[in-house]
Curated annotation (Swiss-Prot):
This is Probable HECT-type ubiquitin ligase-interacting protein creD. Pfam families: Arrestin_C (PF02752), Arrestin_N (PF00339). Residues 375-398, 432-499 are annotated as: Disordered. The lineage of its organism: Eukaryota, Fungi, Dikarya, Ascomycota, Pezizomycotina. GO terms for biological process: regulation of protein ubiquitination; ubiquitin-dependent endocytosis. GO terms for molecular function: protein-macromolecule adaptor activity; ubiquitin protein ligase binding. The keyword Cytoplasm does not apply. It comes from Aspergillus oryzae (strain ATCC 42149 / RIB 40) (Yellow koji mold). The gene is creD. One of its GO terms (cellular component) is cytosol. InterPro entries: Arrestin-like_C, Arrestin-like_N, Arrestin_C-like, Arrestin_domain-protein, Ig_E-set.
C-alpha cells in the first residue's frame, strides 16, 4: 500500500507497507439493541519492512466516539450559541509488540502479520454519519512507536450497521391512510411496507374517488420529511432542557393527473383515479440518514401528502395526509468511506430488495454467538450425550426398557396409572411380541378343557358330542388374556391398575349349551363361582318337584333361572306388577309343559 496511509511522518526505507485489513468491511447487527445477537470482528495488521526498524511498540486501537452538537442562531450580529458534547463510547487495544517501558527492539526486514479478533455485543450503538457536527463513528488506529522519530500511524474506519430482521413487522405490514371527506372525495394512500432500504425508492399507491360532481383533482405533492431530536445528556432525567429538534425535507415530488386518460372505474361502482408514484431516495448519507435512536440521537421519517381539490364553484380545497416510514441500511448495498453508495444503479437497488424478501435463516455454523438461556441445565439436552454411542442402544441398554427415574415420573404424571406399572406392562408386552406364539395340538386342547371343567366344578362329560362345543376346531388356538397382575391390587387405589377379568377360556366354557338329554337329567347344583348366588339353588327348589322332573326343554330351564335371578330387581316395582308378572310367566310354563313334546 502507498505511504499515503501514513500520517505523522516516516520514510519509505523504514516501512514499505503498513495497513489494517478487515475480514468484513462492516459489522451487521440484526434487530434492535435489546434483541440483536453479538457479532464477530476479525482482521490482520500487515507490516512489510525492507530493512531493520527500531521500534518501541506496535499497537492497534479501536475507538468509538459519540458527538452531539447543534448551533442556535442569534438575533445579534455576533452569531449564535453552540451546544455540544463528545464522549468515548468504546475502547479496545491490542499490543502486538511491547518491549517494555523505555525499551526498544529491532525488527528485522521482512513481512509481518498480526491477526486480531473481537466479539462485539449486540447492544452497541450503530454508526451514524452524514451530519456535520453530530455523529457516532468507530475508527481503527494502528501505530508503530519509535524512540527518535515520529510514530508511523495508519487509520481505518469501521462501520457498524443495524438492520432489520427478515421477520420484522416493518417489512410485513403495509401502511395506509384512508377516509371519506363528506361531499368531497374518498381517498386511500398506502405504501406496501413501512420499512424502506436506504438508497432505493418508496412506492406510494393512490386511490382517489370524487364524491362531488364537477370536482377535479389538482396538483399532488409528496414529501419525505426527516426529523432530528438531539439530546446532550440522554441518561440525565433533567435533559429536557438540553434537547434540540430540527426537520429537513429529503425529497419533494409534484404530480398532476391527466384527467382525460387517468379516469377509470373503481370497485365496480364509482369512477376515480388509481395510480402509483415512486419516490427515489438519495444515494448518500449526507442527504438522508437511517432511522435510529441511540446515545441522544433520534432520527425519524414520515411522508406528507397534499392533494389539491378544484371545487365546481372555483375555490380550492386541500387534502392532507401523513404516513410513517422507516429507513434502514441494507448490508447488500455497500457504502464507501465518503458515505455514498458504491453501486448506485437501479439494478443493485432491486437486488437488495429481493435479497431482503428472500433472505434465508442463518447458517448452522453462525450460531456460536447466539445468546443462551441462563438458569438452564444443559444436561440431557445435548445429543448425543457424553456416554452415548454412535448408534441406537439394544436391549436393556435402551432407556425405554430401563427402570431409571421412575420415581420422578410418578411425580410428573397426571393420570391414575403409575409409571412403574406402565413400565412393567410395556416390558411384558415386548416379551410377548418377541416370543413366538405356541400352536397347541388337539391333545393339549383337550387336556386344557378337562382342567377348566374341573376348576369350574362341571363334569367332564357335561358338554357331550352333541353339545355346541363341536363347533370349535380342536386345532384352533385358545384365546387367552393375561390379567393385569403386575401390581398388588390390595394395596393400589382404585383406577391405578386394570380390573381383573376371567380368562377367555373360562368364559367360553360357561357360554356352551349342553345337549337336551343332559339338561333334563341334571338336578344338581352347578357351582359357577362367577354367577349370582340365586343360581346356586336346585331346580326342584326354584320351580317345584313336578316341573323339575318333567321333560322340559332346556330353554324353559333358562327362563326359570332368569325368573329367580330377576326377583331382587323387580322388588323395586309395585307389588301388583310383580305378582302379575310371576303368575303370567308360571302359567305359560305349565301350559307349555302340558302340551305334547
Amino acid at each position: 500500500m502507498a505511504l499515503s496511509f501514513f500520517s505523522g511522518g516516516g520514510s519509505a526505507s523504514h516501512a514499505k507497507y503498513f495497513d489494517i485489513r478487515l475480514d468484513e468491511d462492516y459489522i451487521v447487527f440484526r434487530g434492535g439493541e435489546q434483541e440483536a445477537a453479538s457479532a464477530h470482528l476479525s482482521g490482520k495488521l500487515l507490516l512489510c519492512l525492507s530493512e531493520p526498524l527500531s521500534i518501541k511498540h506496535i499497537r492497534l486501537h479501536l475507538t468509538g466516539i459519540s458527538r452531539v452538537c447543534w448551533h442556535l442562531p442569534s438575533s445579534s450580529a455576533g452569531g449564535g450559541r453552540k451546544s455540544w458534547r463528545e464522549r468515548v463510547i468504546y475502547e479496545k487495544t491490542w499490543r502486538f509488540r511491547d518491549p517494555g517501558k523505555g525499551k526498544t527492539e529491532i525488527l528485522p526486514a521482512g513481512n509481518y502479520e498480526y491477526p486480531f479478533n473481537l466479539v462485539l455485543e449486540g447492544n452497541m450503538p450503530e454508526s451514524i454519519e452524514g451530519l456535520s457536527d453530530t455523529y457516532i463513528t468507530y475508527r481503527f488506529k494502528a501505530e508503530i512507536g519509535r524512540k527518535y522519530a515520529k510514530d508511523i500511524i495508519v487509520r481505518k474506519p469501521l462501520r457498524i450497521i443495524r438492520t432489520l430482521e427478515p421477520s420484522a413487522l416493518e417489512l410485513a405490514h403495509a401502511m395506509s391512510v384512508e377516509n371519506i371527506w363528506p361531499n368531497k372525495i374518498e381517498y386511500s394512500i398506502s405504501t406496501p411496507t413501512k420499512a424502506v432500504i436506504f438508497g432505493t425508492s418508496i412506492r406510494v399507491d393512490f386511490k382517489l374517488i370524487p364524491l362531488l360532481k364537477g370536482l377535479t383533482i389538482g396538483q399532488i405533492v409528496s414529501q419525505l420529511i426527516e426529523s432530528h431530536d438531539l439530546t446532550l445528556n440522554p441518561e440525565d432525567p433533567d435533559s429536557i432542557r438540553n434537547t434540540y429538534k430540527n426537520t429537513r425535507t429529503i425529497l419533494n415530488d409534484e404530480f398532476e393527473l391527466d384527467h382525460d386518460n387517468a379516469l377509470e372505474i373503481i370497485d365496480e361502482a364509482a369512477e376515480g383515479y388509481q395510480f402509483s408514484r415512486y419516490l427515489d431516495l438519495p444515494k448518500t448519507l449526507t442527504r438522508c440518514l437511517q432511522d435510529t435512536d441511540t446515545k441522544g440521537i433520534k432520527v425519524r421519517h414520515k411522508l406528507k401528502f397534499r392533494v389539491q381539490l378544484m371545487n365546481p364553484d372555483g375555490h380550492i380545497s386541500e387534502l392532507r395526509a401523513t404516513l410513517p416510514v422507516s429507513i434502514f441500511i441494507s448490508p447488500n448495498l455497500a457504502i464507501d468511506e465518503n458515505n455514498n453508495l458504491v453501486d448506485q444503479t437501479p439494478q443493485s437497488a432491486q437486488r437488495a430488495i429481493n435479497d431482503i424478501a428472500q433472505q434465508a435463516p442463518p447458517l448452522y455454523g453462525e450460531h456460536q454467538f447466539d445468546q443462551l438461556y441462563s438458569e438452564l441445565d444443559p444436561n440431557g439436552y445435548r445429543t448425543p450425550g457424553p456416554g452415548s454411542g454412535p448408534g441406537t442402544p439394544f436391549g436393556t441398554l435402551s432407556r425405554n426398557l430401563s427402570a431409571e427415574n421412575l420415581a420422578s415420573m410418578n411425580a410428573l404424571t397426571n393420570t391414575d396409572i403409575s409409571a412403574s406399572a406402565l413400565h412393567s406392562r410395556l416390558s411384558n408386552l415386548s416379551n410377548l411380541n418377541i416370543t413366538r406364539p405356541h400352536q397347541p395340538s388337539p391333545t393339549d386342547h383337550e387336556s386344557q378343557n378337562d382342567s377348566e371343567h374341573r376348576r369350574l366344578g362341571v363334569p367332564a362329560d357335561y358338554f357331550g358330542p352333541s353339545s355346541g362345543s363341536n363347533s370349535h376346531s380342536p386345532s384352533s388356538p385358545v384365546l387367552s388374556r393375561r390379567p393385569s397382575d403386575e401390581v398388588d391390587h390390595e394395596h393400589v387405589p382404585s383406577g391405578m391398575a386394570t380390573p381383573f377379568h376371567p380368562q377367555y377360556a373360562e368364559v367360553e366354557t360357561l357360554s356352551r349349551v349342553p345337549s337336551y338329554s343332559t339338561a333334563v337329567r341334571t338336578t344338581k347344583t352347578f357351582p359357577f363361582r362367577h354367577l349370582s348366588s340365586h343360581l346356586s339353588k336346585p331346580i326342584s327348589e326354584m320351580l317345584g318337584a313336578d316341573l323339575a322332573n318333567s321333560s322340559l326343554p332346556w330353554i324353559f330351564f333358562i327362563i326359570g333361572r332368569a325368573l329367580v335371578t330377576l326377583t331382587p330387581l323387580v322388588t323395586m316395582m309395585k307389588t301388583e306388577d310383580c305378582d302379575s308378572f310371576k303368575l303370567g310367566l308360571e302359567s305359560r310354563i305349565r301350559t307349555e309343559a302340558a302340551s305334547p313334546a
